[in-house]
C-alpha cells in the first residue's frame, strides 16, 4: 500500500505539470505565426536559467498588449499602459523591451513579425511616449541585429532623416523642457536632475505653442510620464547594453554632430549656473536666510537677549531653560541663565562674558535666522570682526542702566568700535536696541531712552550710516518685552513701534547673488571623519558633489556633504547661508581661516600687493612708508605693510593731491599701496564688496578702515 504522503506529492506534481502545459499554449500563442521558431527549443530552454521566470511576466503583458491594442485608435492606449507605470517605463526598467529579447537572441524575429495586423508605421510610443510616428526610426534602429546590418540601417536612416530633422528636434524639446535644436538627447543624458527641475516651467508655454503635442500628451499624466521616463531610462541602457549606445549618438545629431555636442555642453553649463527660484521655495517654503550679529559693550545684555529670543521662538525648549536656571542659581549667577543658552563653555559662564562668536539658529513664520553673538570685551575684537564679516544686519545692544551706557560709549568702551567695525565689514543696516529698560534706575523712562539714542545716532551718522538705516527700539532682554511681542503700553506708552522680531521679519529682502560664481571665505575648520570647513556663502550656490577650488593654494576639492544652520544634511546651499561643508582633496592642517572656496570657472583673485583707499580713524602718532599693522580682510588676518602713500584725499571733495603725502594721521583719507607677505584672496570693492573691504588694527585698537581699489 502506497504512502498517502507520496500519493499527495505525486498529485501535486501532476497538477503542476498540467498547469504548466495549460499555460504554455497561452504563452506560445503569438509565436505560432513564425514558421522558423521551434517551440521545442523553448521547452528545452526552460530549466537552464532564470528566463522562464522572466517569460511569463513579459508575455502576459505582451498578451495584454493585444487585448488593449484596439483602444489605441481610441486614444486610450497610452493611458492603459501608464496606469501600469507606463508601457515604456516597464520595459525600460528591465533594460528595454527590445534589448531584453536582443540579449537572449532569436526573439527579435518575434518582434519584427508585426503583431496581428499591427501597422508597422505606428510604433507604440517608444521612449518618450510623445510622438509615436516620429519614434519609428528609433525603434527599428534599437532592435537586435549584427553590426553590419546595424551600420547599413544607420546609413539608410541618416539619409531618410535629413528632411524631418527640424520637426523631430522641436518635438523632443517639448518633452525635455529645453528649447534647443539637436541637443535635447545629450542634455537629458548629462543632466537628468536638471531636466526634472526645468520641465514644469516650460510646459505651459509649449502647450499653447504646440497644440499637436498637447493633444497627444493629454491622456498621459504630465508629471509622471514624459520627463521622468527620459531621465530614469536613459542612464540604465547606456551602462548595461552595448547596442543602443551608438544609436543614441547617431540620433542625437543627424544634421551636424559636432555643432550639437558643443551646444549641448554650453547648455549644460548654463543650466548648472541657473538656479530655479522654485527650487529655493520648495526647499525652504520661500523663507530667505538672514544672519544677525549682536554687538555692543561687555555686559550690555547681548547673550541674554539672544538666549531669550531662542526661547521665545521655540528653538530652545522650556526644560532646557529651566535646567540652565537651576545651574545658574547653584553657581550663584542667578540672573545669567538665559545667556547660558548662548555662552556654552565653562569659562564664559564663570566670567559672565562671551569669548568666542556664539552661533545659534531660529526660525519665524517669514524668515530663517542665524544669530552671531559677538564678544563685547576689547580683548576679543578680532573674533567680533570675524563675526561681523558674516552678518547681514547688526543689532547694537546698549544698556540704559545708569553708568553702563556711559562706560560703553565713552572712550575705551566697545560700543563705538563695534559700530565702526560692523560698518567696515559691510553691515549696512543697524538696529540700536536700548536694553535693560525695565531696570529700577530707568523704569521705561522716555528721557533716558532719548539721551542714549541721540548721542549714539550722531556718532553712527558720522561713521557712514544713513539715517534710514538706523532703527532704535526699547526692550528688556531679560523679561522679553519688545523682543517677540510689542512692549506693553502700560509700561511704555510713548513707544508704538514694532518689536525686534516684527521689524526683522518685515525688512526688505536681501539682494543675494544666487546665480553668481560660488565664493565662500572659510571662517573655521575642523576634523570630523574628514575635513570640514565652515563659513558664509557670499555668492552663488553649491550642491553635493560640486568640484571647487580652494584658494590661494589652488587645491581642487570636492563637496561631499553640506550641513545647514541646523546641522542637518542638505543637497544645496545658497548665497547668504551659514554652512559647513565636508570636502575631499585637502587635509585640515593644510587650510586656515581666510582661504576661500571658489568656483573653478571664475576663481577669486590672489594677491600680495594692492592699492586701497584708507580712512584713518584712530592713531596715536602718525604713519608713513614702511608702517606695519594687522589687516582683517573678510575672514583672513594678515600682517600688512604700507609700501607707498600715493595721494591724500581732500575732505568733502575727495580730490587727490598731486604730491604724495609724507605721512598720514588721524582723520585723514589716503590712497596707498599695501603689501602682505603671503598671498591673500581679495577682490576689488567695486566687484565684490565683501572680499574688498578691510580693517587695520594696531596695539589692540582699530586704526583705519579701507577698501581695495586695484589689485596689483
UniProtKB/Swiss-Prot annotation:
<feature type="compositionally biased region" description="Low complexity">
    <location>
        <begin position="190"/>
        <end position="201"/>
    </location>
</feature>
<keyword id="KW-0677">Repeat</keyword>
<feature type="binding site">
    <location>
        <begin position="373"/>
        <end position="377"/>
    </location>
    <ligand>
        <name>GTP</name>
    </ligand>
</feature>
<dbReference type="InterPro" id="IPR009000">
    <property type="entry name" value="Transl_B-barrel_sf"/>
</dbReference>
<dbReference type="GO" id="GO:0003924">
    <property type="term" value="F:GTPase activity"/>
</dbReference>
<feature type="binding site">
    <location>
        <begin position="296"/>
        <end position="303"/>
    </location>
    <ligand>
        <name>GTP</name>
    </ligand>
</feature>
<dbReference type="GO" id="GO:0003747">
    <property type="term" value="F:translation release factor activity"/>
</dbReference>
<dbReference type="InterPro" id="IPR000795">
    <property type="entry name" value="T_Tr_GTP-bd_dom"/>
</dbReference>
<feature type="compositionally biased region" description="Low complexity">
    <location>
        <begin position="218"/>
        <end position="256"/>
    </location>
</feature>
<dbReference type="Pfam" id="PF03144">
    <property type="entry name" value="GTP_EFTU_D2"/>
</dbReference>
<protein>
    <recommendedName>
        <fullName>Eukaryotic peptide chain release factor GTP-binding subunit</fullName>
    </recommendedName>
</protein>
<feature type="compositionally biased region" description="Basic and acidic residues">
    <location>
        <begin position="202"/>
        <end position="217"/>
    </location>
</feature>
<feature type="region of interest" description="Disordered">
    <location>
        <begin position="132"/>
        <end position="162"/>
    </location>
</feature>
<keyword id="KW-0963">Cytoplasm</keyword>
<dbReference type="InterPro" id="IPR004161">
    <property type="entry name" value="EFTu-like_2"/>
</dbReference>
<dbReference type="GO" id="GO:0005525">
    <property type="term" value="F:GTP binding"/>
</dbReference>
<keyword id="KW-0597">Phosphoprotein</keyword>
<feature type="compositionally biased region" description="Low complexity">
    <location>
        <begin position="48"/>
        <end position="64"/>
    </location>
</feature>
<dbReference type="Pfam" id="PF22594">
    <property type="entry name" value="GTP-eEF1A_C"/>
</dbReference>
<keyword id="KW-0648">Protein biosynthesis</keyword>
<feature type="region of interest" description="Several sort of repeats">
    <location>
        <begin position="16"/>
        <end position="143"/>
    </location>
</feature>
<dbReference type="InterPro" id="IPR027417">
    <property type="entry name" value="P-loop_NTPase"/>
</dbReference>
<keyword id="KW-0547">Nucleotide-binding</keyword>
<feature type="region of interest" description="Disordered">
    <location>
        <begin position="1"/>
        <end position="64"/>
    </location>
</feature>
<dbReference type="Pfam" id="PF00009">
    <property type="entry name" value="GTP_EFTU"/>
</dbReference>
<feature type="region of interest" description="Disordered">
    <location>
        <begin position="76"/>
        <end position="115"/>
    </location>
</feature>
<feature type="domain" description="tr-type G">
    <location>
        <begin position="287"/>
        <end position="512"/>
    </location>
</feature>
<dbReference type="GO" id="GO:0005737">
    <property type="term" value="C:cytoplasm"/>
</dbReference>
<dbReference type="InterPro" id="IPR054696">
    <property type="entry name" value="GTP-eEF1A_C"/>
</dbReference>
<dbReference type="GO" id="GO:0000288">
    <property type="term" value="P:nuclear-transcribed mRNA catabolic process, deadenylation-dependent decay"/>
</dbReference>
<feature type="modified residue" description="Phosphothreonine">
    <location>
        <position position="370"/>
    </location>
</feature>
<feature type="region of interest" description="G5">
    <location>
        <begin position="476"/>
        <end position="478"/>
    </location>
</feature>
<feature type="compositionally biased region" description="Polar residues">
    <location>
        <begin position="1"/>
        <end position="23"/>
    </location>
</feature>
<comment type="function">
    <text>Involved in translation termination. Stimulates the activity of ERF1. Binds guanine nucleotides.</text>
</comment>
<comment type="similarity">
    <text>Belongs to the TRAFAC class translation factor GTPase superfamily. Classic translation factor GTPase family. ERF3 subfamily.</text>
</comment>
<feature type="region of interest" description="G3">
    <location>
        <begin position="373"/>
        <end position="376"/>
    </location>
</feature>
<dbReference type="InterPro" id="IPR009001">
    <property type="entry name" value="Transl_elong_EF1A/Init_IF2_C"/>
</dbReference>
<feature type="region of interest" description="Charged">
    <location>
        <begin position="144"/>
        <end position="282"/>
    </location>
</feature>
<dbReference type="InterPro" id="IPR003285">
    <property type="entry name" value="Sup35"/>
</dbReference>
<dbReference type="InterPro" id="IPR031157">
    <property type="entry name" value="G_TR_CS"/>
</dbReference>
<keyword id="KW-0342">GTP-binding</keyword>
<feature type="binding site">
    <location>
        <begin position="435"/>
        <end position="438"/>
    </location>
    <ligand>
        <name>GTP</name>
    </ligand>
</feature>
Amino acid at each position: 500500500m502506497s504512502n498517502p504522503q507520496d500519493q499527495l506529492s505525486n498529485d501535486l506534481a501532476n497538477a503542476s505539470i498540467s498547469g504548466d502545459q495549460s499555460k504554455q499554449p497561452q504563452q506560445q500563442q503569438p509565436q505560432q505565426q513564425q514558421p522558423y521558431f521551434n517551440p521545442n527549443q523553448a521547452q528545452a530552454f526552460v530549466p537552464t536559467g532564470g528566463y522562464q521566470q522572466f517569460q511569463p511576466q513579459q508575455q502576459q503583458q505582451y498578451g495584454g498588449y493585444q487585448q488593449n491594442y484596439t483602444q489605441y485608435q481610441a486614444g486610450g492606449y497610452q493611458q492603459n499602459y501608464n496606469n501600469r507605470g507606463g508601457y515604456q517605463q516597464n520595459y525600460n526598467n528591465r533594460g528595454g523591451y527590445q534589448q531584453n529579447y536582443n540579449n537572449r537572441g532569436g526573439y527579435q524575429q518575434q518582434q519584427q513579425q508585426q503583431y496581428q495586423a499591427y501597422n508597422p508605421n505606428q510604433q507604440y510610443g517608444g521612449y518618450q511616449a510623445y510622438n509615436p510616428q516620429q519614434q519609428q526610426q528609433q525603434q527599428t534602429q534599437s532592435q537586435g541585429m549584427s553590426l553590419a546590418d546595424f551600420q547599413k540601417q544607420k546609413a539608410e536612416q541618416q539619409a531618410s532623416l535629413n528632411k524631418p530633422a527640424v520637426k523631430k528636434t522641436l518635438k523632443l524639446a517639448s518633452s525635455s523642457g529645453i528649447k534647443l535644436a539637436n541637443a535635447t538627447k545629450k542634455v537629458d543624458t548629462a543632466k537628468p536632475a536638471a531636466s526634472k527641475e526645468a520641465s514644469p516651467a516650460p510646459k505651459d508655454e509649449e502647450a499653447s505653442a504646440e497644440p499637436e503635442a498637447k493633444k497627444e500628451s493629454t491622456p498621459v499624466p504630465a508629471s509622471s510620464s514624459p520627463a521622468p521616463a527620459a531621465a530614469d531610462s536613459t542612464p540604465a541602457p547606456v551602462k548595461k547594453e552595448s547596442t543602443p549606445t551608438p544609436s543614441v549618438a547617431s540620433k542625437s545629431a543627424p544634421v551636424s554632430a559636432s555643432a550639437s555636442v558643443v551646444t549641448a555642453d554650453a547648455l549644460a553649463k548654463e543650466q548648472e549656473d541657473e538656479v530655479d527660484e522654485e527650487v529655493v521655495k520648495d526647499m525652504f517654503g520661500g523663507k530667505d536666510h538672514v544672519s544677525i550679529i549682536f554687538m555692543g559693550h561687555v555686559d550690555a545684555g547681548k547673550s541674554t537677549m539672544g538666549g531669550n529670543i531662542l526661547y521665545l521662538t521655540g528653538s530652545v525648549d522650556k526644560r532646557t531653560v529651566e535646567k540652565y536656571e537651576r545651574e545658574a542659581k547653584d553657581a550663584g549667577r542667578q540672573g545669567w541663565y538665559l545667556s547660558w543658552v548662548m555662552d556654552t563653555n565653562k569659562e564664559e559662564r564663570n566670567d559672565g562674558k562671551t569669548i568666542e562668536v556664539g552661533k545659534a539658529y531660529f526660525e519665524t513664520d517669514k524668515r530663517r535666522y542665524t544669530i552671531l553673538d559677538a564678544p563685547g570685551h576689547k580683548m576679543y575684537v578680532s573674533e567680533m570682526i570675524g563675526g561681523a564679516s558674516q552678518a547681514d544686519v547688526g543689532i547694537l545692544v546698549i544698556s540704559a542702566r545708569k553708568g553702563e551706557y556711559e562706560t560703553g560709549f565713552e572712550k575705551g568702551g566697545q560700543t563705538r568700535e563695534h559700530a565702526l567695525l560692523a560698518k567696515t565689514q559691510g553691515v549696512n543696516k543697524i538696529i540700536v536696541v536700548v536694553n535693560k529698560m525695565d531696570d529700577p534706575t530707568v523704569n521705561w523712562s522716555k528721557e533716558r531712552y532719548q539721551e542714549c539714542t541721540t548721542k549714539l545716532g550722531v556718532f553712527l551718522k558720522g561713521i557712514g550710516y544713513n539715517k534710514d538705516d538706523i532703527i532704535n527700539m526699547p526692550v528688556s532682554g531679560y523679561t522679553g518685552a519688545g523682543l517677540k511681542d510689542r512692549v506693553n503700553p502700560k509700561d511704555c506708552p510713548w513707544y508704538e513701534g514694532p518689536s525686534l522680531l516684527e521689524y526683522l521679519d518685515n525688512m526688505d529682502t536681501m539682494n543675494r547673488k544666487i546665480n553668481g560664481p560660488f565664493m565662500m571665505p572659510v571662517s573655521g575648520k575642523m576634523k570630523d571623519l574628514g575635513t570640514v570647513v565652515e563659513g558664509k556663502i557670499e555668492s552663488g550656490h553649491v550642491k553635493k558633489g560640486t568640484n571647487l577650488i580652494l584658494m590661494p593654494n589652488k587645491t581642487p576639492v570636492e563637496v561631499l556633504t553640506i550641513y545647514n544652520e541646523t546641522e542637518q544634511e542638505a543637497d544645496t546651499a545658497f548665497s547668504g547661508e551659514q554652512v559647513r561643508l565636508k570636502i575631499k582633496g585637502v587635509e585640515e592642517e593644510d587650510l586656515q581661516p581666510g582661504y576661500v572656496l571658489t568656483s573653478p570657472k571664475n576663481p577669486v583673485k590672489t594677491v600680495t600687493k594692492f592699492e586701497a583707499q584708507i580712512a584713518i580713524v584712530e592713531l596715536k602718532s602718525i604713519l608713513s612708508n614702511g608702517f606695519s599693522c594687522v589687516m582683517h580682510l573678510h575672514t583672513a588676518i594678515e600682517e600688512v605693510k604700507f609700501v607707498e602713500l600715493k595721494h591724500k584725499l581732500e575732505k568733502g571733495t575727495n580730490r587727490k593731491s598731486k604730491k604724495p603725502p609724507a605721512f598720514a594721521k588721524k582723520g585723514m583719507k589716503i590712497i596707498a599701496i599695501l603689501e602682505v607677505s603671503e598671498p591673500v584672496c581679495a577682490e576689488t570693492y567695486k566687484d565684490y564688496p565683501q572680499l574688498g573691504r578691510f580693517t587695520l588694527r594696531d596695539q589692540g585698537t582699530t586704526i583705519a578702515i579701507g577698501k581695495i581699489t586695484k589689485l596689483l
